[in-house]
């Protein structure tokens, strides 16, 4: 795997070296995030503004206040964009571009959307790969629940927990594939974490022949929030 990509072992090394969680008030957590990402502070995802309920926001400075129950997921909120590497049973190895959006509307969950497109050897987009959408929740006991659907015909439920205040690991409890979906997709786990440069790294591992193997990984920089 190219050195610029984020392997499972690399992510684990980075995140385990981070400072363990400390108690933060809601204001302290928001202020810390605001200081780290000044360059993307002026941008937000579009909203029509004419609904009787709050529009989604991916910028903690705009829209409704983040629900207090989501403070452990606060660093994820924003739009992230970058490149990654895939090694799948269906299509082999390839490079991809990706955009991930974590947004909220003031309620006690985050909305999640991922768009992935294939890249050629020169880094140019060649084809849309697939999309994911879903919701992230976390309990008062720091138990994470994630519900995801894939445009390829997959629905998954993940459970997990924060590893520290900058990393979150989830494992699939249920993976359902439609008749036209990727029949070889097995159960898996994911790790999302902020790297020392404050980029978001993530990796997806899947069960293949009785062992977990990296399937997709990427390093993304914040462009909104």
Swiss-Prot record:
Against Pfam families, the record matches this protein to: THAP4_heme-bd
Taxonomy, superkingdom: Bacteria
Short sequence motif GXWXGXG: positions: 78-84
Q: Which family does it belong to?
A: Belongs to the nitrobindin family.
What the entry lists under PANTHER family is as follows: PEROXYNITRITE ISOMERASE THAP4, THAP4 PROTEIN
Protein name as catalogued? Ferric nitrobindin-like protein
